[in-house]
């Protein structure tokens, strides 16, 4: 048995520190080795204890979590899991943290929540195991091809991601031109975060990016992000495809689920689709991507070296669902190659 993941808990609330510590300590594969109430205490604790993982509150006195995270990533890079309030302001700050290099995020529990921090221990263990080199600077993103260079065909694109997906999706979608193929995305994320993430992507990318709504038509130049929460994103509609938000139990522990999206794309579009599975814990999306490939779609997976967590892409690759494994920096361009109109017509 490998050594437990060693964690430093940083939060200005003694109650929250106690709750996080209790949740993590209930897992024998996690060891809380220290606590800190602000960034100054945390800095000294990191030097003294050398933790494998830090859980970091965003809103703290003396120095907020974002400023402290930047210092960690610059001076002593390590896996950091952000702990945030489930508000619009908290979502904006968390998304900024994920772009800076935080491993993942969890929301602070609301009143009466049945399982507070239910997946935190699993995220901590994944963070401790990650092979990602946190000291590596983010690769520069090439400008998207111009409209004149890209003629869109008839295919739709479906993308699934989880842990590490914020950075990965930005890297992929910033390669898309304004006239990109219709694209649907399921990213595992808390309900209040997806709207803020869609707005952030819309500011960063050439196409229009929006949170998916029930009945929204799939259109060229638009990207639809599954809203977090109570429903799954599917596509349907035959010759006039549209988004559908459906009430179903969680699949693979997730709602929305990547498998649900990929299954619907396989049924609707068959060979006129491209499926992409990016970094993430677990196996959600692997079976659905295999279904897409069996239906004739082209399928891509992110390489282990460029994943924050090589979980979902690994399972998909082992199942035979992935036609090509590519580094993150190459995926956006490959999607455009696979969805471009042929010279003699459109596909």
From Swiss-Prot:
Q: Any idea where the Response regulatory domain is?
A: 6-123
Q: Which UniProt keywords apply?
A: Chemotaxis, Cytoplasm, Hydrolase, Phosphoprotein
Subcellular location per UniProt equals: Cytoplasm
* Annotated EC: 3.1.1.61, 3.5.1.44
| Domain CheB-type methylesterase: start-end pairs | 150-342
Record-level Gene Ontology MF annotations: phosphorelay response regulator activity; protein-glutamate methylesterase activity; protein-glutamine glutaminase activity
Instruction: List GO BP terms, alphabetically.
Output: chemotaxis
> Is Hydrolase one of the keywords?
yes
Which enzyme class, named as a word? hydrolase
User: What is the role of this chain?
Assistant: Involved in chemotaxis. Part of a chemotaxis signal transduction system that modulates chemotaxis in response to various stimuli. Catalyzes the demethylation of specific methylglutamate residues introduced into the chemoreceptors (methyl-accepting chemotaxis proteins or MCP) by CheR. Also mediates the irreversible deamidation of specific glutamine residues to glutamic acid.
Q: What is this protein called?
A: Protein-glutamate methylesterase/protein-glutamine glutaminase
Q: Which organism is it from?
A: Rhizobium etli (strain ATCC 51251 / DSM 11541 / JCM 21823 / NBRC 15573 / CFN 42)
